[in-house]
Amino acid sequence: MPIIEISSLTHPGVDVFCMLTEAQLRQRMEPGKGVFIAESPNVISRALDAGYEPLALMCERKHISGSAAHIIKRCGDVPVYTGDRELLTTLTGYVLTRGVLCAMRRPVLPSMEEICRDTRRIVVIDGVVAVSYTHLRAHETS
């Protein structure tokens, strides 16, 4: 895992954390596969447990050997961008949640056939714009 010290807001490689909108992240690299930003060690750990692929980390310097150490280790050889809190806050626009962010590849969405297989009830919601916050599961009681 290369630790890369950030010295300016235009440092190469950090655009995924600050220069792209949610829509641009969804289409990053190739349509159908995009990128999302996981915030905090707990969220990153759950994403890794679910099989999501880490692409890069951004971490406050003090957390590299602290609260983010286990996440950094689990992410293998992905770059870890670091700097002081003020620079990272300016770069991202907010204080990093528990000091660490992780850019991760979005999974390929399942086909309609896969979604509907063995399903008795489907809910269709119109007008949802930010799907990253919509995690609905319908549980049917017998």
Regions found by a protein language model. Give the residues of each.
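Structural motif
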Residues: 59-63, 126-127
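Acidic/glycine-rich phosphate/pyrophosphate-binding loops and surrounding catalytic core
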Residues: 93-119
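Conserved small/polar residues in nucleotide/adenosyl-binding loops
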Residues: 134-141
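Glycine/small-residue-rich loop that forms an oxyanion/phosphate-binding "nest" at active or ligand-binding sites
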Residues: 89
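Short, aromatic/basic amphipathic alpha-helical patches
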Residues: 66-76
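A glycine-rich helix N-cap at a beta->alpha junction
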Residues: 79-82
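Boundary-proximal intrinsically disordered activation/regulatory segments immediately upstream
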Residues: 1-61
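Short, glycine-rich nucleotide/cofactor-binding loops
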Residues: 32-37, 122-132
